[in-house]
């Protein structure tokens, strides 16, 4: 299984296993056991690298003081053989819940003193929560055994596995968050928002060799990790990043530490604290000697997603250096207190990205004063309005604010990104194209992007009384539908409404004149019969499609060279960005095609390509010719059900290498479907009396009873004829079903063999079909999508005034006249005729 499949399997099982335990609580147990496995496997790996064999491992006890000391100094902790995760697994039915209790107590006792801050108390939430996994010792043992068996297959023993482990950890956290309701906000920032903030920060820090990053409300730590990963792409050395984190809630603080350690971050680069960020600021100090170890923390970047509009205590904080130059946030809303905390802790050339409720942009009082001071101090770099319902557990409209200390320009970039998203269950989610559009706008800082972004001067903000509400500066609303009164009365197409399609007329300069004839300076009429054909066959439109085809004519070969020929060497993390630059460059001279729509197509395919590249680069090219057992759950047990391609899907290989066998099998399956239809037809021919006979049951023929009825010959001749035909169908169906089953099994086995014996060139061809052909097909569809949308809009304008009010009035008059004629023919009693006479008056008949 790839990491996506493994993560999905673990989540599905874990969600079933948690039963009545809240998702918010259960996550602490499964993630805690994952972390213990990671630490256990890491120690075993270090020991084996230092000549310990499996046999020697059994002698690993804390009674061996020399070994204990060596392991603690090198690994940061010590786990005895009896307490190793692998030992728990090997115990099988002898494993007991108490084994975990003993192991966790021993771990806490045997942490290396130099690593206390990283590991001390990290399993506290798991230890206290074990009792909730079952009411009896036996129930707890079963629940824990199920949990450790669930995660035993997660790889944790090599550099490449940090990504797999981290992916699964993030996947589980995000899914638990989706099921945790309002509590999700305590520990999780959606990955897409985290990625957006990370890209902005990493761009700002791209030229630095060493950086420090800090999250004062760290939650699960995912936001910090994403920043680190993005920054490492520019820096090249992830070990030159130091991570600082503070979190108020103990269980969430433990998630932060686990997540950072499991991503392969060096313990010396992790500095975390469990505390109240607003009450206990971070001049860093050792608890046992606060005066002599006082060290104010200033970092390159602060990122945070603090609790929204949280109550806090501003008393006696007027002279606190974090707030003294700006003011104190109101006690009922700590949003600006968190922001000022973040701003204080960056270096003069640092950057802050913080998620806040949009009310901070326009609320008055103390918040208005702070906002004014931030503008006057030139600290606000950008404001990004996010879509509604983007965070788990809250529908509050939110923004990302970007802040800096020594900003050279005095304007503020305001981006309204509230319209760009996709639905994901109950929530909205940023797409890859939405993130890139925002990040590109931040990097390029244009004067204006219509309905999306604008650079606003400080003078304009001051003129608006320091109100930063986004709609004041960027109008992203759609144009309201309007109706032209003249065209509604007399017909014709308003030139003003055609002008709304000006981008198309610019791209196709001669098209408008070919489609429309002018009635006067303000109105025109359509002079072609088939609008779509007239548009698509016009020379300007043909030239547009040809230009696109020329721009991407050799892109297939380009992709083949980049991805297929270079699959073992390319940097997968940076390749998508390089390909996006190439696509954007090719689209530079092509009007109308949205480059971000093209980027989304690339990203959709890249997710699949990246998984394959990761496998090939970590396991070798031979992995492409590998098949794996297809494991499925049957009656709570995992059993094998055939095989699946490790990289190459069976369906792809069959369509290319075994199309004749596949076609023959599909023909048999088609015939089976036809037989089912023929049964229905024969049933329809039966009388209702026949349908009550034993040879029909639940609207289906019964094979054995059909034979009996034929043999007895007690039915009508027509019915007997039907039954004989049905009996023949039963025989054919039985033969076909066996044949389909046998042929399917044979095809499956042959596909396995074909994959295992592919030549390298055949593999490259199949990868080309899997990776490149779908992307090319999607990209080549972009011009057609543009033209379809254009024709749809144009057709709507043309049809809008096709029927005038005069036409409607005429139709009404004709209908009334017709109705009057019908009323004249009606007969009835005295009262009926009086009613009809009155109706005729209303219709103008008298």
List each model region and its residues:
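Non-catalytic, mostly N-terminal accessory regions of nucleic-acid modification and defense proteins
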Residues: 1-201, 271, 277, 385-388, ...
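Conserved Class I SAM-dependent methyltransferase catalytic core
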Residues: 9-10, 16, 22-38, 330-403, ...
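Conserved nucleotide-binding/hydrolysis micro-motifs of P-loop NTPases
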Residues: 36, 220, 250-251, 278-279, ...
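A generic secondary-structure signal for well-formed alpha-helical elements
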Residues: 37-50, 54, 176, 205, ...
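Conserved S-adenosyl-L-methionine
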Residues: 183-304, 309-313, 320-326, 330-332, ...
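Conserved P-loop NTPase
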Residues: 400-441
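Eukaryote-biased recognition of long, low-complexity, charge-rich segments
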Residues: 433, 437, 441-451, 456
